[in-house]
């Protein structure tokens, strides 16, 4: 079964080994459940916003249909102060693309929420409360559009807000492989359901 992962630094696994990326860990978890999932094909880059992911997909369009497609995008829209309604429109278009890559089956698409970077060391000296509120607002948009489309919503934001030793990478911003393992754990149920549709 083919798995396509679309996103930004969180999907490419900035500052972690390739085996620590959450899509890779998710594929391993699905294989452990006897689901014959291949390694994920990843279209993602650190710093990408919704429009940049769209351009990235256009530059290297995936071929054929996928049995599972994941989407996680929006933190850089929030970080750069982009308009939330612009995010809605661009997210909706990306979600439609994801459904297209899944052979037109929204039930084969999983969307992960945006994690809260406001709790990290990188956010010291910034308004952590505002960052968290902005992330929540963007996620409310993502969740409503995802559910309206009939895709699966996976909320990793609460996990990103947990205070565990070793929860972030050495850069003090991006998640560690351990946190990504938790995300994969949270996504297993939705991904399993998606693959059985």
Predicted segments, located by residue:
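Conserved, well-ordered alpha-helix/loop/beta-strand core segments that scaffold catalytic motifs
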Residues: 70-72, 108-112
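Charged helix-capping and loop-helix junction motifs
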Residues: 85-94, 138
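A short helix->loop->beta-strand "cap" motif at the edges of active sites that frequently abuts
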Residues: 99-108
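Oxyanion-hole/transition-state-stabilizing segment in secreted/luminal serine hydrolases
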Residues: 50-89
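Solvent-exposed loop/turn segments at secondary-structure junctions
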Residues: 9-12, 45-50, 75-80, 115-119, ...
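Serine-esterase "nucleophile elbow" of acetyl-processing enzymes
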Residues: 1-46, 56-65, 181
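Catalytic His-Asp segment of secreted/periplasmic serine-dependent ester chemistry enzymes
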Residues: 115-197
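Short, solvent-exposed loop/turn segments at secondary-structure boundaries
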Residues: 14-19, 81-85, 130
């Amino acid at each position: 079964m083919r798995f396509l992962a679309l996103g930004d630094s969180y999907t490419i696994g900035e500052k972690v080994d390739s085996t620590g990326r959450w899509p890779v860990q998710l594929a391993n978890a699905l294989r452990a459940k006897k689901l014959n999932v291949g390694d994920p094909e990843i279209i993602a880059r650190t710093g990408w916003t919704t429009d940049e992911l769209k351009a990235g997909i256009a530059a290297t369009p995936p071929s054929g249909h996928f049995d599972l497609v994941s989407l996680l995008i929006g933190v850089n829209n929030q970080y750069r102060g982009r308009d939330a309604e612009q995010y809605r429109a661009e997210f909706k278009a990306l979600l439609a693309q994801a459904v297209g890559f899944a052979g037109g089956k929204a039930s084969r698409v999983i969307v992960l929420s945006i994690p809260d970077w406001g709790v990290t060391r990188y956010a010291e000296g910034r308004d952590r409360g505002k960052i968290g509120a902005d992330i929540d607002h963007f996620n409310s948009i993502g969740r409503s559009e995802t559910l309206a489309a009939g895709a699966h919503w996976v909320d990793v934001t609460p996990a990103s807000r947990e205070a565990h030793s070793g929860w972030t990478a050495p850069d003090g911003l991006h998640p560690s492989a351990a946190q990504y393992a938790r995300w994969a754990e949270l996504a297993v149920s939705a991904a399993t359901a998606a693959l059985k549709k």
